[in-house]
């Protein structure tokens, strides 16, 4: 069983990683192709392309200029400790022990606009390139065309090597669109997290993102390899709702008063 997650825009570059183990991204040669093009963009072009402030555009122009291989622990950081958004706050990998972190390495993959598909302990350098960015490149008009079936093929290889036939999709639609589900050789399960508000259950983005990270943490802490065991997920008041679920979409609900 493998999980896929989206990356995060916010990055934690300052704090040292709690573990020394690391791996290298499998698709770094592809990343280098993209970065060569990104380096050609002036800050104003980055601001327009990514719809960000001049300050953020300048920061990322500097990141692009400084991006260089080979990646080492001195100039890069493991992805699971670099990403710093809602999902990763829910996962809180910094407080997992080494056995649990190795579980993440063996069961979790992170989608990325620049790096394609990452293992949690893959070293990365800071960047900003969301998968949905309309970044015209050598292979097409956007990143979905750039990556084509590369991410899907690597996922299939990863699943096959592990003898796994289940992929748990905890990524956003923007990122999971980079996976060709028609060519994916795995059973696909998509957990959906709903919170009660004014008597009705709905997906609330912040809570849903955090819950995705919580589920991965739950799996790591319990060393889950059987997807059915995920139905026992109960962190922060969530509970599996069988009546609202089907074979491929598993719904977890949380009552308003529990938060």
Curated annotation (Swiss-Prot):
The cellular component terms of Gene Ontology attached to this UniProt record, alphabetical and capped at eight, are: cytosol
Q: Name one Pfam family in it.
A: H2O2_YaaD
Q: What superkingdom does the record give?
A: Bacteria
Report any one BP term from Gene Ontology. response to hydroperoxide
Q: What is this protein called?
A: UPF0246 protein NMB0895
Family designation: Belongs to the UPF0246 family.
Which InterPro entries does its entry note? YaaA
- PANTHER family reported in the protein's UniProt record: PEROXIDE STRESS RESISTANCE PROTEIN YAAA, PEROXIDE STRESS RESPONSE PROTEIN YAAA
Q: Which HAMAP family match?
A: UPF0246
Query: Entry's NCBIfam families?
Result: PRK02101.1-1, PRK02101.1-3
């Amino acid at each position: 069983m493998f999980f896929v997650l989206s990356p995060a825009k916010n990055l934690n570059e300052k704090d040292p990683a709690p573990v020394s183990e690391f791996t290298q991204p499998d698709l770094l040669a592809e990343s280098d192709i993209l970065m060569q093009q990104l380096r050609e963009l002036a800050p104003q072009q980055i601001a327009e392309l990514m719809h960000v402030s001049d300050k953020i555009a300048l920061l990322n122009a500097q990141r692009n200029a400084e991006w260089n291989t080979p990646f080492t622990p001195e100039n890069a950081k493991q992805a699971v400790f670099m990403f710093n958004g809602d999902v990763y706050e829910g996962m809180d990998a910094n407080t997992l022990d080494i056995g649990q972190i190795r579980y993440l390495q063996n069961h979790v993959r992170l989608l990325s606009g620049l790096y394609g598909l990452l293992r949690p302990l893959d070293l990365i350098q800071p960047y900003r390139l969301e998968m949905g960015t309309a970044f015209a490149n050598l292979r097409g008009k956007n990143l979905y065309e750039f990556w084509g079936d590369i991410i899907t093929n690597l996922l299939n290889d990863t699943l096959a090597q592990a003898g796994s036939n289940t992929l748990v999709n905890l990524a956003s639609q923007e990122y999971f669109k980079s996976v060709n589900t028609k060519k994916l050789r795995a059973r696909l399960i998509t957990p959906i997290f709903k919170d009660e508000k004014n008597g009705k259950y709905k997906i609330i983005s912040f809570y849903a993102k955090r819950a995705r990270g919580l589920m991965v943490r739950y799996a790591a802490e319990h060393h889950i390899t059987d997807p059915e065991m995920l139905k026992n997920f109960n962190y922060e008041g969530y509970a599996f709702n069988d009546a609202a679920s089907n074979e491929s979409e598993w719904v977890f609900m949380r009552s308003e008063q529990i938060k």
